[in-house]
Structure formats: structure tokens, C-alpha cells
């Protein structure tokens, strides 16, 4: 009888913990910085701030820098705890080379109203794409996703014509990442926002570049490798950073790899 009582208590505890995590899951997935920062305040005076409207009416802050001539335009999607202002140095380096930028703050981020969800972020990405596509031809648009933003980038590039795709620390699915911590929960059944990039990336036909650190403690390198395997684009590349973690790839040569990719140099190199 004692063992039965213990089992019942443990089962009830498990159910309670599962319920708590289910109802609070989005607060554990999204960490929005809610402060609105203009490009000038962030130190990127070259950029203009524009307002986009998503299909559901949400208004979104975005940064825009026109490219020099036919140079690429980066359509940039940051991670779940990111903000455009954290990538100013990266943007500045790209802009110096004449590359353009359309960077969007998701709903709930950067002073925007609303709350982030998978469907919401996808709608935000489509609004950013519509802005870019109205000004630049599809082959000039390069989609760059970082961490959670890779799922947004994959979904967009799988559905819209783009010139190139850059995925920095991509993951196969949100459940796969979360299961490393919550291994004891049926996350594929519980998670509202699945972000199944593994099911979408095969639909991308544009050239793909994957950047991933072998020491990444947030999204294991094995997931980046798996995403590379699932990519059916005939022109695909993966650049591995031996000592790279999750957010330090710029200091390890990521922008150099991106520059070569944008210039088409990697297209002429043998695949790994």
C-alpha cells in the first residue's frame, strides 16, 4: 500500500509539473526585449526605421538600409532573446560592403505590441518579405536566421522565392531542443510552437549556408549537421567553427564565410 501511495503522489506531481510547463511554455521559449531602440540610438545611423503591418494587423518596427546597386539585401531574423540593436556591429560590417538590410523586430519585441507565437513570427516574416520584395527582386534577397530565427527563415524561404539562405545555429525542431532539458516530458504532444524546420528545409531550392559552432551549448552542432543533411538544395554549404559556441561566431570568422557565400565563392568550392 505504501508503494502505491508513493506512486500516486509521484504521478500527481508529474501531472502537476506537466500542467505548469504546458501553460507557461511560451514564457520559457521567448525572452523579448520590449524596449524600443531606434537605429540611431543603437549606433546605426545609416538605417531608417520603418513600420510594417503583418497580415493580422500587428504593427512591427523594422530597420532598412538600401543596398549599393545590385548588392544583396539581408532579410534578418534574430533569436528568441535577441534584438536588432545587439547585431549593430554585424550590420555595420555588412553595410560597409554595400549590402542592404531589412531587419524586423517580432511582435512583442523592440517596443512592438502583441505576444510572440510560431504563427505570429511567421506572419511577421512575411510582412518583412513583402516590404523587401516590393523594392528588390527575389534573387537579391538573402534570408538570414539566427538561432530561433533560423526556423523563421526556413519557413519563409521554403514558401517564398529568395536568392540565398543563411542559417546560423539552426535546430531541427523546438521540441528537440527543449527535450535536452525536459527529457521526461512528451514535448512533441505538449508544445504549442513546434518550429519543425526539419520538415520544411527540404522545400528550399535557393543556395543554403549553415554556420554552427562545434561547442554550441544551446543548439548542439549535431542539429546543424542534421539540417545540412536534410537540405535538398543543390548548392549547400556548412561552415564549422571548432571553438565556436552559440553567439560568438562573428569573432571566429562567420562574416568572412558569409562574405564568400554572398559573392558566390563557396559555390565554386567543393562541398564538405
Where are these regions (language model features)?
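Membrane-embedded segments
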Residues: 55-135, 146, 151, 157
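Short beta-strand/loop motif that positions the catalytic acidic residue
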Residues: 203-205, 210-216
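Acidic catalytic loop of the alpha/beta-hydrolase fold
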Residues: 214-219, 246-248
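Catalytic histidine neighborhood in serine/cysteine hydrolases
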Residues: 225-247
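Post-His helix in hydrolase/transferase enzymes
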Residues: 249-263
Amino acid at each position: 500500500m505504501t508503494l502505491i501511495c508513493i506512486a500516486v503522489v509521484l504521478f500527481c506531481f508529474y501531472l502537476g509539473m506537466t500542467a505548469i510547463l504546458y501553460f507557461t511554455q511560451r514564457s520559457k521559449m521567448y525572452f523579448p526585449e520590449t524596449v524600443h531602440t531606434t537605429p540611431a540610438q543603437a549606433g546605426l545611423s545609416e538605417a531608417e526605421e520603418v513600420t510594417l503591418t503583418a497580415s493580422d494587423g500587428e504593427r512591427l518596427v523594422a530597420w532598412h538600409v538600401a543596398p549599393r546597386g545590385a548588392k544583396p539585401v539581408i532579410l534578418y531574423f534574430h533569436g528568441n532573446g535577441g534584438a536588432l540593436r545587439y547585431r549593430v556591429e554585424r550590420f555595420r560590417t555588412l553595410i560597409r560592403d554595400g549590402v542592404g538590410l531589412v531587419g524586423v523586430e517580432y511582435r512583442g519585441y523592440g517596443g512592438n505590441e502583441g505576444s510572440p507565437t510560431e504563427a505570429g513570427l511567421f506572419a511577421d516574416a512575411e510582412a518583412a518579405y513583402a516590404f523587401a520584395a516590393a523594392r528588390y527582386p527575389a534573387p537579391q534577397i538573402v534570408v538570414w536566421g539566427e538561432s530561433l530565427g533560423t526556423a523563421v527563415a526556413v519557413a519563409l524561404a521554403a514558401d517564398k522565392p529568395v536568392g540565398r539562405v543563411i542559417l546560423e545555429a539552426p535546430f531541427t525542431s523546438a521540441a528537440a531542443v527543449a527535450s535536452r532539458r525536459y527529457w521526461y516530458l512528451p514535448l512533441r504532444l505538449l508544445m504549442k510552437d513546434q518550429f519543425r524546420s526539419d520538415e520544411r528545409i527540404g522545400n528550399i531550392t535557393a543556395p543554403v549556408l549553415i554556420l554552427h559552432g562545434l561547442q554550441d551549448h544551446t543548439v548542439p552542432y549535431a542539429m546543424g549537421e542534421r539540417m545540412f543533411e536534410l537540405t535538398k538544395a543543390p548548392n549547400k554549404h556548412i561552415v564549422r567553427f571548432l571553438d565556436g559556441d552559440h553567439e560568438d561566431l562573428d569573432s571566429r570568422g562567420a562574416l568572412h564565410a558569409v562574405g564568400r557565400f554572398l559573392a558566390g565563392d563557396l559555390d565554386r568550392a567543393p562541398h564538405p
